[in-house]
Amino acid sequence: MKENVAGALSYLLGPITGILFLLMEKESQFVKFHAMQSTITFAGFWVLDIALSFIPYIGVLLIPIVGLVAFITWLVCIYKAYSNEWFKLPVVGDIAEQQIGGV
């Protein structure tokens, strides 16, 4: 599989495909980076959604906004990975890079 396709697919189901590609990929730093960034980013969005669900009134208002931000982030990350770009999200991109051993 081409690196750009594998990188884009690592975002498809968020942390699920991110973890799968982390386990399967042994050589490509590009794929490992995008898989790690996907795992950290979208696991974070899931945790944030769960935390917001416990906050009365404001949480209900913020969950759709977080969902929209997550969806836009998801689309941008898939596009950038498919375009062979080492696109780093703020903060999360640096963490992902450190976790895979630097690029």
Curated annotation (Swiss-Prot):
Keywords: Cell membrane, Membrane, Transmembrane, Transmembrane helix. Pfam families: DUF4870. GO terms for cellular component: plasma membrane. The chain crosses the membrane at residues 5-25, 35-55, 58-78. The keyword Transmembrane applies. InterPro entries: DUF4870 (IPR019109). It is found in: Cell membrane. It is a multi-pass membrane protein. Its main location: membrane. It comes from the Archaea. Disulfide bonds: none annotated. PANTHER family: UPF0132 DOMAIN PROTEIN (AFU_ORTHOLOGUE AFUA_3G10255). Belongs to the UPF0132 family. This is UPF0132 membrane protein AF_0105.
